Amino acid sequence: MLPRKREIVAGEVEDLQKKTRAGEGEATREEGDAAMAGRGNEIDEDLHSRQLAVYGRETMKPLFGSNVLVSGLQGLGAEIAKNLVLAGVKSVTLHDDGNVELWDLSSNFFLSENDVGQNRAQACVQKLQELNNAVLVSALTGDLTKEHLSKFQAVVFTDISLDKAIEFDDYCHSHQPPIAFIKSEVRGLFGSVFCDFGPEFTVLDVDGEEPHTGIVASISNDNPALVSCVDDERLEFQDGDLVVFSEVHGMTELNDGKPRKVKNARPYSFFLEEDTSSFGAYVRGGIVTQVKPPKVIKFKPLKEAMSEPGEFLMSDFSKFERPPLLHLAFQALDKFRTELSRFPVAGSTDDVQRVIEYAISINDTLGDRKLEEIDKKLLHHFASGSRAVLNPMAAMFGGIVGQEVVKACSGKFHPLYQFFYFDSVESLPVDPLEPGDLKPKNSRYDAQISVFGSTLQNKLEEAKIFMVGSGALGCEFLKNLALMGISCSQNGNLTVTDDDVIEKSNLSRQFLFRDWNIGQPKSTVAATAAMVINPKLHVEALQNRASPETENVFNDAFWENLDAVVNALDNVTARMYIDSRCVYFQKPLLESGTLGAKCNTQMVIPHLTENYGASRDPPEKQAPMCTVHSFPHNIDHCLTWARSEFEGLLEKTPTEVNAFLSNPTTYISAARTAGDAQARDQLERVIECLDRDKCETFQDSITWARLKFEDYFSNRVKQLTFTFPEDSMTSSGAPFWSAPKRFPRPVEFSSSDPSQLSFILAAAILRAETFGIPISEWAKTPNKLAAEAVDKVIVPDFQPKQGVKIVTDEKATSLSSASVDDAAVIEELIAKLEEVSKTLPSGFHMNPIQFEKDDDTNFHMDVIAGFANMRARNYSIPEVDKLKAKFIAGRIIPAIATSTAMATGLVCLELYKALAGGHKVEDYRNTFANLAIPLFSIAEPVPPKTIKHQELSWTVWDRWTVTGNITLRELLEWLKEKGLNAYSISCGTSLLYNSMFPRHKERLDRKVVDVAREVAKMEVPSYRRHLDVVVACEDDDDNDVDIPLVSVYFR
């Protein structure tokens, strides 16, 4: 059984609810004002690091100065406001003139039953403020006037009549400067967005991608000129792109910085719309870089756009005719609400018919745009569920609209132009719903019941769900599941596991966490917060990593009891493992992921779709070791090398020293046994650390850092260029220093150079830490004292050496080369090490430093950025600031709240289908979306690959079972009856039987499980009744046949 955490969580929930009601832990308005006043344009890089990786400082600063209005605080408005507060705008003003109803609890996670009867906006203010004290959150109640809008940079309306929207949009469109106007609605399983950012809106960066670059190999003197690039990496240029050139030798006319147009772009070449016939002949070198000019977009005001909408932004091309119909449907609903002052009643035939009639009458006025056919069944679904704001739809559209507000305030990314319509009518149950099943039950789920019926609601509440991960995706999922009522009955259960703890950088997206949760387990805190949203949620919070090592926790009984699995993971290895378990136990897996403004979802449904592991992205291309260590040509190479050197000097070598000191005999014996270049290098580093480079004072650390600077950035470069002078030729007669290689030059040290001095001080501080030496305060910032300390270091003159071997083979995997006398050298080093160790004080040990990217006070990134930038200076590569260095060296995954919210909303729309059952593969949807462009690509999942043999067929989802505790011979005969000749049977990594081995025939009459216990040393857990074996088979024509896993049941 799983460890129960219910009692702990429930107690924590009660405390948190008391705090919330008492207002504890929440910012007062005065505190909010103070936070705002103190913030200015300062960006908390620890908090916003993942967001900065998406937007950059140039976007965050105008965003931090923006005031936004969100009108309509049902679920959609709450989601938009949440995303904006997390993004860090200057202020968010909430407007709603309605009061909280029980109905609202289906989609607004800020509200509870205690808020019923209060104004919606006022009920949300304090909880929204708690998400980010640097954002000023306030409420505006009562009637909204045009004059109210003038103080905002962007206004969002989620529940407004069309006439009023047109009035407000006209004001915003003609205002100077224009106010960005967004109208968005979620009506049941249907949603819409309209954007108007004014007569002319300038987009500063249309896609957020880094400008593409190429390394030039040749340029023709022609019209147009043919530009060829090195074949290290494919070019990403497209026809019509603008590019600039730099560092071109010979044809220097191209270095003028003038943007030139690309045409006929190919993987490694393109033509340039330029006559270079009179230019100088190309000699060598050259970098070509994409130029991304600003784009001006002219928006139509809403009134004009309603009658002339232009092209709709598509999402699902199987519904190509759907957007014009939904454009009509939303107008018909608006007319119904205007005339009757209410929404249609769910299941009411009369109300549905009236909406359809309105749609037909509006359609008759459209002239050339009149629709030939109107799908009345679709309009029935639309009208019947239109009052409901469903949580998954609110989450999805909250992400989309939140991102559009960021675009409006910053000019970053291409705006949505201008209408977007979406529906997920496939989420409805397969069987028709009766009107009685849609009636409200005075429940917090009434809105959801009005769309899906009470039968599905009961299934949701009794669901047994396993959610893996409780970070950014996990927080969104927990909020969604709690609002949907998933696992909220006595029979339901939601298990969430995550072995990670909360860090400050999580807080800008993982909104269930607060400052005071830093250091606590993510799963426990998230589960506690989810139970505040819905106290009836039955949740178990675990801190176990789901992996082969924890199959005693997540055992067969656990998996067999599940209804679905939701992944909220951030790495492929874990995803692959969970996918394999879902295939094995035949459980639906709902998969999703984000990368900056991009997100994707994948549905893995037993027997209907392919599994996650069936298709994988190609692995990222790794730079050759010789490129990173001797021939870098971009900053990524420099940073890869910098992190490697950091770990070698400050973590691996001190760890090696401690390994030797803890057990010298064992360590020396292992070095002798290995007897290779790696063992030799390790011994040399340990001796250096304990002898020549041993530090006893902080000045020793300064000396070490200064000499390392000279070694890395001067001596090694001098040796490299001595071995390979600038005019060197390869064995084939080509210049050695040709693209992509860049000829390096040594860096001359100067203590008056702040970047050089800062690097040496940071390196000295970390070196002192490894030796446990107290750090002088004056060393923490560059100053005169620090410069004097560095300048007093005596630096020996460098003398180049003959015969030094430098690895140039791109296929080499090691920089160390074996030598015939390695064993003799190792013996000398061991003798030296034993001698050195006698001089060490008793109890001496070192303190290895493990790289931590998210602490700006620990000097780790100062060292890595310094390493990389000095290296870049050697090779004339553009340098980067510490923040950019952190993104690359720290391998930070760019992340923002908006794409995360959208992904989880889409997944939860699929969860309705998975839990309802009975849906066909064509009802499910996989999605790839990029909110930056914006692009929405929605398609049916791919069915699993089917293998056929004679009259049999199977897929990855099938598992063959054999009962009766059979022998190996009986298993072979069982397969023979299927027309399959088995020649090999294995269990895990052990071979139980192979027809080629005569001795294996002695095993044929033994039980399969007994052979596995003996050969594979396998003990089958007491809770498991079967053993899995992999069988290799051939047909009668000796063709291999891949068969499913075979489970032999023996008890």
Swiss-Prot record:
Region spans: Disordered: 1-42
Catalytic activity: ATP + ubiquitin + [E1 ubiquitin-activating enzyme]-L-cysteine = AMP + diphosphate + S-ubiquitinyl-[E1 ubiquitin-activating enzyme]-L-cysteine
Alphabetical list of InterPro entries matching this protein: E1_4HB, E1_FCCH, E1_FCCH_sf, ThiF/MoeB/HesA, ThiF_NAD_FAD-bd, Ub-activating_enz_E1_C, Ub-E1_IAD_1, UBA_E1_C_sf
Recorded GO CC terms: cytoplasm; nucleus
Comp. bias intervals (Basic and acidic residues): 1-32
Keyword terms: ATP-binding, Ligase, Nucleotide-binding, Repeat, Ubl conjugation pathway
Intervals holding Sequence repeats: 56-194, 453-605
Highest taxon of the lineage: Eukaryota
EC number per UniProt: 6.2.1.45
Catalytic residues, chain numbering: 626
Pathway annotation from the record: Protein modification; protein ubiquitination
Renumbered residue ranges of the record's region 2 approximate repeats: 56-605
GO biological process: DNA damage response; protein ubiquitination; ubiquitin-dependent protein catabolic process
GO molecular function: ATP binding; ubiquitin activating enzyme activity
Binding-site list for ATP: 472, 498, 509, 522, 570-571
Transmembrane segments: none
One Pfam assignment: E1_UFD
Other information: There are two active sites within the E1 molecule, allowing it to accommodate two ubiquitin moieties at a time, with a new ubiquitin forming an adenylate intermediate as the previous one is transferred to the thiol site.
Family note: Belongs to the ubiquitin-activating E1 family.
Protein known as: Ubiquitin-activating enzyme E1 2
